[in-house]
Design a protein with these regions (language model features):
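Bacterial N-terminal signal peptides that target proteins for export
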Residues: 1-9
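Exposed acidic/polar residues on beta-strands and adjacent loops within beta-sheet cores, strongest
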Residues: 21-194
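Bacterial N-terminal signal peptides
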Residues: 9-17
Length: 194
């Protein structure tokens, strides 16, 4: 009985220690969203980033759900190793296309990114690093506002939030420079989901 209690206690302590580390790493990744005017990571003329290398194999059932390329921009993303996820958004000669490098066990995107193209030119990404579904800073909805503005909403988790239910969201307004096709964040605001 005592050895069972010791094992159960040790396991509980290990799980709690890992949970706090996971929460800390999520906060570090999404900290750019805490700035009222985030610094821009997009620069004119940058190439489309390659998909991150993933350890292990991707479940072929998830990969079968990827959208086939339809546009030249889709092909450019595929050439960099990205699977296309969901429908692209377009208007005002702007395209927003989501790509992922991998999937979780429920075929949700892991190591994904949203790419913005303006008049066929790569203008940048909607996050400074690839994101994982159901983690702090995961990109949700993107709304095209005009020919030079879009808004993106990011899920925000506290370490105590269940994975199903982020307690906050951060909306970031992005402008597209007219002189050079480059996407820049101009403001960020966080609100409660309650």
């Amino acid at each position: 009985m005592t050895s069972r209690l010791v094992r159960a206690t040790s396991l509980t302590i290990a799980i709690m220690a890992c949970q706090s580390e996971i929460g800390r790493s999520q906060v570090k990744l999404a900290s750019w969203l805490d700035e009222p005017k985030p610094a821009s990571w997009n620069k004119p003329g940058l190439p489309i980033p390659a998909a991150p290398r993933i350890q292990g194999n991707v479940d072929p059932r998830c990969r079968d759900l990827a959208r086939p390329p339809q546009l030249e921009e889709d092909n450019r993303l595929r050439d960099q190793g990205w699977d296309l996820v969901g429908a692209y958004q377009g208007g005002w000669q702007i395209l927003v296309i989501r790509g992922t490098a991998s999937y979780d066990g429920m075929c949700r995107p892991r190591q994904y990114q949203d790419f913005v193209f303006v008049r066929g030119v790569f203008a940048g990404t909607l996050s400074p690093q690839a994101m994982d579904s159901r983690t702090d800073g995961a990109l949700g909805r993107v709304s095209l506002q005009s020919n030079n503005r879009l808004t993106a909403e990011y899920e925000r988790y506290f370490a105590t939030d269940p994975l199903c239910c982020p307690s906050r969201k951060t909306s970031v307004v992005f402008d597209i420079a007219n002189d050079a096709s480059v996407l820049r964040p101009v403001s960020a605001s966080t609100s409660s989901n309650k």
